[in-house]
Amino acid sequence: MQRSGTAFAASFYLKLQRIKPFMLVKPSFKKRLLLTTLLSLSATQIFASNNSEQIPIGKLPEWVIPESYDLDFKIDPAQKGYTGKTTIHLKLAQATDHIWIHGKSLTVKDVNITSAEGIKTKAKYEQASEIDGVSKIKFAKTLPAGQYQLVLDFNAAYDQQLDGIYKIEFEGKPYVMTQMEAISARQSFPSFDEPRFKTPFNIRLTIPSKYSGFANTQQTSEQIEKSGWKTLNFAQTKPLPTYLLALAVGPWQLQKGPDIGATSWRKQPIQLRGIAPDAKAEKMQHALSETPAILKTLEDYFAFGYPFDKLDLLAAPDFAAGAMENPGLITFRDYLMLLDKDSPVFFVQNSFNVNAHELAHQWFGDVVTMPWWDDLWLNESFATWMQSKITQKLHPEFNADLERITDTADAMKSDSLVSVRRIRQPILSNADIQTAFDGITYQKGAAVLNMFENYLGEEKFKQGVRNYINKHQYGNATANDLISALAEQSGQGERFTRAMKSFLDQPGVPLINTALQQEGNKVFLNVKQ
C-alpha cells in the first residue's frame, strides 16, 4: 500500500488504510486480540492434553513441503457460500501417520492422499485450533517418505469481514473477491498458509455464465456447462505464497488499458486492463494511463522485466485494505481507481502513489518474498521507498521529496516511544503478524533504506538491489540476504553489515543534538550524542 502526495495524506493513508483489514473493520481489535490469544492458548492446551504433539500455531513443521496446488472453485455470488477442491502435490521428508495444515471455518467432506505409485489412502481432517486456523490430517496408516497428492473436497461460507473469499453487494448486485494477506488463505481453502511455501497454482473457476471471472493469470479456456454454468481455466502461476492468490467473480466490467510493448528487459508485451463494478470501468482510464510509465521506471531500476503474464487493476467497491499487490490482479479501493475531471487533487495524487506502491511490490514481495513475517519490512519498506522515487521522477509536482522528509520525522516520533518495537520484530503468533503492519514497518523502514542509499551512493545501492532480485527470483529471501548484497557493493563487508543491522534489529535511532553558541567574535558548534 502507499501514502499520498501530501504529509496529511501520508499520515492518513498509512495509519487508516494500510493497517490491512485487521484494525479497519474490527474496531474492538485490542479486545479481540486478547480474547484470540486466550482462546488460542486454551485450544492448544486442550488438544495437546490428548495428543503428544503440540499444535504448531506459529510455523508448520518443515518435513512437509508443498510443491504445487490445483484449486477448483465453484462460485456463485448470489449464494451464501462456495464449494472447492484442493489438490496439493507435496513431499513428505519423513514417514508419518499425519500432517499439519492450515484450514479455518471450512467444512471438509472428503480427504485422501495418493502416493507416486498410485496407492490411495483415506484420511481424516480434524480442526485442531479454530482460532489459529491449524488442522490435522490423520492417515489410515503410516506413509513412508516420498511424493504424494493430497486431495480435499470442502465448502465454506463467504466471509463477512472482507477477508479471504468474501461477498459484497453493490448497487443491488453481488460480487465475490478476495483478500488473503496476511493469513486469510487458510479460511478460503486448505493450504500451507505461510510465505515460505511458494509454489505454482493451477486455478479453475466454475461460475454462472452471466458473470465474469478473474484470477492471477490469463484465462486459457472457457467451457460451457449445463444449467447456466461455465468453467474457466487459468494459466499456471509463477511460484507464489498463498497470501498473494486472488480471484474475482461477478458482473464486473472491463476497460482496456494502453498497450505496454516489449522492452529490453521483457520480450513479451503486457496485457493491461481495468476491472470495475458494472458501468464504472470507464472511470479507470486515468489510472490505467499512468501505469505504463510506472512499470517502465521499475523495470529500468531493477533491470528485470515485469514478471507476470498480465496486469489487471481491480476497483473494489468494498475493500478493507487500501490496496493489495496480488500479481496479475492488483486490487484497490474503488475511489483510488475511479477518477474523472472533477476528482479532487488529493485523490489523483493518492491514486498514482498507491498504484506505484503496489507495482513496486511485484518485485519486492511477489518475485522475492520473505520466508516469514519478521521480514515483512522487505515488502513494505521497499515498496514505500520505491514509490517515493517513482513519484519524484514522474510527477515532481507531487513533492515526494518533501513528503519523504515528513515521513521520516513521523517515523522518528513513533520511534521515540517507550513501547516502540524494532523493524525486524520476532513473530511468534498470529497476533504478532497482524500488528506488524504499522508505521515502523512502512515509514521507518523506508527512511532507513533512503539513508543507506545516500551512504552507498545511488548506483551501488541499485546494483546491490538488482543482484538481490536476480539471485532470489521466485524464491524467498531474508534481511540478511539483502544486507549481504548491499555489503558486497559497499566494499566495506562486515562494517556495513553491522551498521545496517543496527538500524533493523534495535528500536530507536541515534540522536545528535547541535547548538550554536557565540562568545565575543567567535561562534562554537556544540555537538552532543
Model-derived features: where do they sit?
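Beta-strand-rich interaction surfaces with strong enrichment in secreted/lumenal proteins
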Residues: 71-74, 88, 125-126, 138-142, ...
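Hydrophobic alpha-helical and helix-loop surface patches within well-folded domains
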Residues: 108, 133, 234, 261-528
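Bacterial N-terminal signal peptides that target proteins for export
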Residues: 24-34
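Extended, low-hydrophobicity, Ser/Thr/Pro/Gly-biased non-transmembrane segments
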Residues: 60, 89, 151-262, 286, ...
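Ligand-binding face of N-terminal immunoglobulin V-set domains in extracellular IgSF glycoproteins
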Residues: 83-104
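A surface-exposed beta-strand-loop module
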Residues: 105-170, 227
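Bacterial N-terminal signal peptides
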Residues: 36-45
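N-terminal, polar/Ser/Thr-rich
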Residues: 47-83, 91, 118, 170-174, ...
